[in-house]
Amino acid sequence: MSQASALRAPTPQALPPMAREQALRPDVNEAHVRFIGLGKTYPGQAQPALQGIDLNIRHGEIFGIIGRSGAGKSSLLRTINRLEQPSQGRVLIDQVDIAPFNEDQLVALRRRIGMIFQHFNLMSAKTVWQNVELPLKVAGVAKAERQRKVRELLELVGLQEKHHVYPAQLSGGQKQRVGIARALVHTPEILLCDEATSALDPETTASILELLRDINQRLGLTIVLITHEMAVIRDICHRVVVLERGAVVEQGEVWRVFGSPRHEVTRTLLAPLQAKLPAALQASLQAHPASGNSAVVLKLTVLGEPELSALFNDLGGRVRLLQGGVETIGEHALGQLILSVQHSPHDTHQLLERARRWAEDVEVLGHVD
């Protein structure tokens, strides 16, 4: 049996009755996880941790949740496997409301939802093999089946040669790979990642992201992750939601949100990823034109690589490219251009309208002489 077939999602017969029909006809555009009017207030706290969350997470996508500290990211993530019980609203998994689940149903649900953590949560007195095998032993899985599953999972995460060692002998990245293998032992449909790369160096983070991407593609898992590292969202996620004080303030495809953030919170979170203006330009920027010879400085976010000569001709006047670059997010190339426009025949309003013909987003940075 191949790894992919051995680790594929549970058969419809293993799902709750209401979800079986959905599983027989999965649609990547249908909601795998759906939040409806979700709210959460902790005892003794006046400010809700979550409020009015309406959100869909699609089958097979990698979905990111970002926000400032205390925005409600972990609270939202933990409602998916009901480690947190909402105060209001509903959480639906494959169109099934999980709120009324009893203990047996919750056990079955949590076996369908794997979870990995920032600090690995491995048992130091057990080997790599034993750490991965433990949930299967607790579930009463036969020894032969346990051995087969653990062997396949350790091969999947690239640790088959480390099966006999203890966590203290592993690097941080290797420990997280053990955590990922353990999270997959019950062949889940959903994988929750709670700051899974925050304790890792950049090189190790990249390798873990590549592993998660491979698992997503090969096994068809829906992956939901929270992180404070915006580069992680950019590099791996298909869509993203931004939370602030427990509410959704922005959501969409990653390339659109990162290329043209609309909300102030989103712009603040993404600021470290933005190319910095040259120091000389930053120092010379003024809020208003100082004279008739002043040039307006524009930042344009464009899809693909525009024909600069045609863009400059459309803007009119004397146009200078002060800074530019292109990066790829997902399958989309996004360019960022910093231009100064002097003596344009168009007033500022007309100039911005013309710039928007070419750009996903246009921002006036200021004026320079």
Curated annotation (Swiss-Prot):
It is an enzyme of class 7 (translocase). ATP binds at G67, R68, S69, G70, A71, G72, K73, S74. SUPFAM superfamilies: ACT-like, P-loop containing nucleoside triphosphate hydrolases. Its main location: membrane. CDD domains: ABC_MetN_methionine_transporter. Coiled coil: none annotated. Part of the ABC transporter complex MetNIQ involved in methionine import. Responsible for energy coupling to the transport system. The complex is composed of two ATP-binding proteins (MetN), two transmembrane proteins (MetI) and a solute-binding protein (MetQ). This is Methionine import ATP-binding protein MetN 2. It comes from Pseudomonas putida (strain ATCC 47054 / DSM 6125 / CFBP 8728 / NCIMB 11950 / KT2440).
